[in-house]
């Protein structure tokens, strides 16, 4: 190369290096803008998610918010409220990357106070640049995205709308985000909570939940996997293979062709436990119970004994074998010796506790002491077991005396005499 060409080569090299440096600087700026735009898009998605949660919260609590707001005084919804009610996940942060905090201000519509409208506004933190506000307002997908540039007015993306913050009782500053939720938007949210969706909506289990009774108009529910309910009322039949109940089963009547097995008690409040065909109650474990096989007797299954620490009471008690008592035999009713009785062989007691037995149709003592009574009266002497003449009087006076039981076996004794002086001795067996 000639010496006079060297300067041109150096100049060309420097120019090339300058161009490369300019391209690098330009590319770095483009990359910086790209990264910044992606960050703003992420912020817009977070605002959209927050606004969607606020929209659902308003729809769910529409009536409550109507009662706590006016056309000028808002009901304020915070991030904490949305997290506590499950509309936002517990990990959602209270502030965004710039330290701004989102809140929703809900008021009644001035033209139609029965309707609600709301605005989501960010406050505090570091203001966004205008470029970021314009970009984020366009990227917000829930509600109408906007921004606050003068601290008093919310302006929509592409300046499509403008609303004073004071209309919603909201306060903020320059460089903050605003999202408008119109009356139509919130009415739709309220309807979402009342509409039953046929398919599952991720994150919205409330859309598959009924909040009132449903009338099927006598139509069927077919191909049901499981029916979970607190109670059930059926005017017709219930057909099935098996049934498991952890609580009560109630009905006017029930018919079972085979067996009914209960893990607990079977109770009847006002009715009977009715069996038929010589059946009754049976304890399967021990083989005892009660049944009737005729119209007269309640019988013990397998001739089992009946045991109780209380009383067994009846009109009469009959033992075909021996009658045992582990203590004493107490006869409560009393009889009178000499009174009539039937049948022979009855055992009783008098009022002093002495044992009497029915002998020949008359209550009489069993063993005991003889009581002798001497009587001088004439005529009826009384009731005694036996009477005899104890004294006749004077034989030289041709005196006679007679003692007789009349009628025979009646224990009624009489004394007859010609003159006085005859004494009768009568015996009573105590």
From Swiss-Prot:
InterPro entries noted in UniProt: Enolase-like_N, Shufflon_N
SUPFAM superfamilies: Enolase N-terminal domain-like
Constant region: region residues: 1-361
Region described as Variable region: spans on this chain: 362-430
Domain of life of the native organism: Bacteria
Record's keyword terms, sorted: Plasmid
Other comments on record: This protein is expressed by a shufflon (= clustered inversion region that works as a biological switch). The orfs of this region share a constant N-terminus, while the C-terminus is variable.
Protein name: Shufflon protein A'
Organism: Escherichia coli
């Amino acid at each position: 190369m000639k010496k006079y060409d060297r300067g041109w080569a150096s100049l060309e090299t420097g120019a090339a290096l300058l161009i490369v440096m300019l391209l690098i600087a330009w590319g770095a700026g483009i990359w910086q803008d790209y990264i910044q735009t992606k960050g703003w898009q992420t912020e817009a998605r977070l605002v959209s998610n927050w606004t969607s949660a606020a929209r659902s919260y308003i729809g769910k609590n529409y009536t409550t918010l109507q009662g706590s707001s006016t056309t000028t005084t808002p009901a304020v919804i915070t991030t904490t409220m949305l997290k506590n009610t499950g509309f936002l996940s517990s990990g959602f942060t209270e502030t965004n990357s710039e330290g701004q905090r989102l809140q929703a201000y809900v008021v009644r519509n001035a033209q139609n106070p029965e309707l609600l409208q709301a605005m989501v506004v960010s406050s505090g933190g570091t203001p966004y640049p205008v470029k970021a506000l314009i970009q984020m307002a366009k990227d917000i997908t829930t509600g109408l995205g906007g921004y606050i540039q003068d601290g008093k007015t919310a302006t929509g993306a592409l300046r499509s709308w403008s609303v004073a913050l004071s209309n919603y009782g909201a306060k903020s500053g320059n460089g903050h985000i605003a999202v408008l939720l119109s009356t139509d938007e919130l009415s739709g949210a309220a309807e979402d909570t009342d509409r039953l969706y046929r398919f599952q909506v991720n994150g919205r289990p409330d859309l598959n939940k009924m909040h009132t009774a449903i009338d099927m108009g006598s139509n069927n529910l077919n191909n049901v996997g499981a029916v979970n309910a607190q109670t059930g009322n059926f005017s017709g039949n219930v057909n099935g293979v098996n049934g498991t109940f952890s609580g009560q089963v109630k009905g006017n009547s029930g018919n079972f062709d085979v067996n009914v097995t209960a893990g607990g008690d079977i109770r009847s409040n006002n009715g009977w436990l009715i069996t038929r065909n010589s059946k009754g109650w049976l304890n399967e474990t021990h083989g005892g119970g009660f049944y009737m096989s005729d119209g007269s007797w309640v019988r013990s299954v397998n001739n089992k004994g009946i045991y109780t620490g209380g009383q067994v009471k009846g009109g009469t008690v009959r033992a075909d074998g021996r009658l045992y008592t582990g203590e004493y035999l107490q006869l409560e009713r009393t009889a009178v010796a000499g009174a009539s009785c039937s049948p022979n062989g009855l055992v009783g007691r008098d009022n002093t506790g002495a044992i009497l037995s029915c002998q020949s149709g008359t209550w009489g003592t069993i063993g005991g002491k003889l009581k002798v009574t001497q009587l001088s009266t004439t005529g009826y002497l009384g009731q005694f077991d036996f009477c005899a003449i104890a004294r006749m009087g004077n034989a030289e006076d041709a005196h006679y005396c007679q003692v007789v039981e009349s009628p025979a076996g009646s224990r009624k004794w009489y004394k007859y005499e010609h003159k006085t002086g005859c004494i009768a001795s009568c015996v009573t067996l105590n």
